[in-house]
């Protein structure tokens, strides 16, 4: 079981319960898919705005702009490692997710779910630094999102 902590820090986000439910469903689907159902850990999600995300992105990545999602693993994991007591933190910027969903003709909830899945996979050691890593991570995202009844987010991009 993984404990989920949600913090909503800006206006415009749906209620905390809905964000918790989306996160819980995504997390359970990921952990089942990766055969990690028995892991005991904790994850924190901060739902914020572009202004705060740009500050965090500048501080931690040297990029003075907002982004959709950032993940901060509590401990560095390699793919396949079992997480420790704290999985890590995920930060999501509302305006960026809304704009991307509109530009890609996706529902906000589906795109938000994708960003949560993407962030959790980063916490579990998955990356997209190389073409091979990106292909592997995208394929995993596709499979997980399909289980969540969400269309392939990369279909139009391929």
From Swiss-Prot:
PROSITE patterns assigned to the protein according to its UniProt record, in alphabetical order: UPF0054
Superkingdom per UniProt: Bacteria
A biological process from GO: rRNA processing
Main location: cytoplasm
Cofactor(s) named in the record: Zn(2+)
Root EC class: hydrolase
Chain sites annotated for binding Zn(2+): 118, 122, 128
Homology family: Belongs to the endoribonuclease YbeY family.
Cell location: Cytoplasm
Keywords associated with the record: Cytoplasm, Endonuclease, Hydrolase, Metal-binding, Nuclease, Ribosome biogenesis, rRNA processing, Zinc
Function according to Swiss-Prot or TrEMBL: Single strand-specific metallo-endoribonuclease involved in late-stage 70S ribosome quality control and in maturation of the 3' terminus of the 16S rRNA.
Molecular function terms from GO: metalloendopeptidase activity; RNA endonuclease activity; zinc ion binding
EC numbers for this chain: 3.1.-.-
UniProt KW Kinase keyword: no
Protein name as catalogued: Endoribonuclease YbeY
A Pfam family hit: YbeY
Taxonomic path: Bacteria, Pseudomonadati, Pseudomonadota, Alphaproteobacteria, Hyphomicrobiales
Record-linked SUPFAM superfamilies: Metalloproteases ('zincins'), catalytic domain
Any one GO cellular component localisation term in the record: cytoplasm
Cofactor note: Binds 1 zinc ion.
């Amino acid at each position: 079981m993984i404990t989920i902590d949600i913090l909503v820090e800006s206006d415009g986000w749906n209620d905390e319960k809905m964000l918790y439910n989306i996160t819980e469903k995504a997390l359970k689907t990921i952990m089942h898919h990766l055969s990690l159902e028995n892991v005991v850990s904790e994850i924190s999600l901060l739902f914020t705005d572009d202004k705060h995300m740009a500050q965090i992105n500048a501080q931690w990545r040297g990029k003075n702009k907002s982004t959709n999602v950032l993940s901060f693993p509590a401990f560095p994991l390699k793919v396949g490692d079992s997480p420790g007591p704290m999985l890590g933190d995920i930060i999501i910027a509302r305006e960026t997710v809304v704009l991307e969903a509109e530009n890609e003709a996706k529902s906000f909830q589906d795109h938000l779910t994708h960003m949560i899945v993407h962030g959790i996979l980063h916490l579990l050691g998955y990356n997209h630094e190389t073409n091979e890593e990106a292909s592997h991570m995208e394929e995993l995202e596709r499979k997980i999102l399909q289980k969540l009844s969400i269309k392939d987010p990369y279909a139009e991009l391929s």
